[in-house]
Amino acid sequence: MKRFTFSVPQNILFGEGVLKELPGVAGKLGGKHGFIISGPTLNRLGVVGQCEEILTQAGIAVSTFCDTEGNPSVETVERAAEAVRASGADFIVALGGGSPMDVAKAVGVVAKYGGSITEYEGADKVPGAIIPLITIPTTAGTGSEVTAFSVITDHKRNYKLTVFSYELIPAYALLDPTLLTSAPASVAAACGVDALIHAEEAYVSLDASPFSEAMSEKAMELIGRSIRTYVADRSNREAASDMLAGSLFAGMAFSWARLGNIHAMSHPVSAFYNVPHGVANGILFPYVVKYNEEAAFEKYRKIYNNISTEKKSAEEFSKGMLEQAVRELNKQLGIPAKLSDVGVTREHFSQMTEDAMKSGNIAVNPRKTGSEDILGIYEEAL
């Protein structure tokens, strides 16, 4: 067994109704003034107000920023950080999907240490602890509530920059399945596929360890058995719980094992064409599965048996089956089949390939990958 390191420096509360624990959690952080970062949809639906009321009834002051967008930008981080500084808040609550959480992590850095988030791009450039952060996911997808990453779009470069630091890991994550009922089917599908891909890429990663593999396997089991049910009926509490737990385990898995070519390639797609992250990942999923098959085949049957409606023995399983199962799942969930379906053209392929190759995920992809391979996958997926 190869050497590995694994630690989880975080507190996680999971279950129906744990949102009500928010004041107590804030109190453990010494919080007197919370700053909620969320999006306009959750604000309109009253979810932000619900969270705000829970805090104010406990005597905790609250300020809000409800202007995060999909693929959040450097400018959004700057505006939110200025609002945090002006408010005097001493802890941040990230409420929503991956976008508010990415913004909140970045804001926790910039509001405390100054400068632009671009100055912290890369690994281990955050000088110390950020403003204490509590994450409350309302989608089952990114796993950002437990990860050490923040991904922010730099429109000046048409580039999605990544900040990696263990300082970004939130102090607390509150996972309440009752909050997942407001997601539209299309969002539930894209987020669910994203979570599944987190588990799959971490599972076949060259950095996978027994701990990360165990989490990946459990994530794939939970997501595989419930994603179709949840997308069809977001009010199904059992399916929502499976999806939320699966997303959590997948997030923990890739925090330590990292990801692969799918994420390396999807970030440029989103940066150049503003395609939702989960949709971009989902489109690329079968093409990268096909590319990696020779190197990762030994693990493919377990992935297949978790996501397919059929089970195969070792004797029955053969090449191409996982790719086909992914295509069938995407079709069932309404994920587009081609990049051209979401407006992507060859115009930016050269720069997109260059940007994908900058990703640290390329190095841990199970099959060695060069720029010509990335370009070839983009071409095939078009």
Regions found by a protein language model. Name each.
Residues 43-115, 229-240:
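N-terminal small/polar loop signature for handling phosphorylated ligands or for N-terminal nucleophile
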Residues 149-257:
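Carboxylate- and glycine-rich phosphate/diphosphate-binding segment that chelates Mg2+/Mn2+
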Residues 345-382:
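Short, amphipathic C-terminal "tail helix"
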